[in-house]
Regions:
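Short catalytic/metal-binding and nucleic-acid-binding patches
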Residues: 1-167
């Protein structure tokens, strides 16, 4: 008979920006859908019976909405079928956790995306890390065999219009 092993409970990440981190610092974030592997974000019109504007279009529009209203500053957002990667600067108040939570709640309620409860974040400490994560994000669909070149991938929001505001 197999014994049940108690797995460690993963700590909930605080997603707070420490006071010593400069305003306008970039964060690499990953938000996963559940269940893993199910394409919720990258369906195209005509595929799988999709006839309306796609969820992916709506997710990127919601990202753009928050960017244009200074809720956050998005440098790059790329959708994969079951997750997204983004590089975003957040205001200290209401902060990263609240901004992401509210955005996920809106997208889930309006467009039916099933998000994983939490998300991953990593502060990008210098220009080298920023370039490294930008390349990683843009190459993700190529590595997964979804397109041949990064510029062929449709599901990208990259405004590159200004530096993060000083909130």
């Amino acid at each position: 008979m197999l014994q049940r092993m108690d797995l460690p409970v993963r700590e909930k990440l605080p997603h707070t920006i420490p006071q010593w981190v400069a305003d306008g610092s970039w964060f690499f974030i990953t938000i996963n859908c559940v269940p893993p592997g199910k394409n919720q974000l990258c369906l195209t019109p005509g595929a799988h019976g999709v006839t309306r504007p796609t969820v992916g279009d709506a997710v990127l529009a919601a990202m753009k909405f928050n960017h244009e209203r200074f809720i956050w500053h998005c440098r790059l957002c790329l959708l994969m079928p079951d997750h997204l990667h983004a590089i975003i600067a957040f205001p200290r108040e209401p902060g990263m956790a609240t901004c992401v939570k509210n955005w996920k709640k809106f997208v889930a309620g309006k467009h039916g995306v099933d998000w994983q409860r939490d998300f991953f974040d990593h502060r990008l400490r210098d220009h080298h890390e920023l370039q490294e994560k930008t390349s990683y994000i843009l190459m993700n669909p190529v590595r997964k065999g979804l397109c041949e070149r990064p510029q062929d991938w449709l599901w990208v929001y990259r405004p590159n219009d200004r530096r993060p505001p000083h909130w």
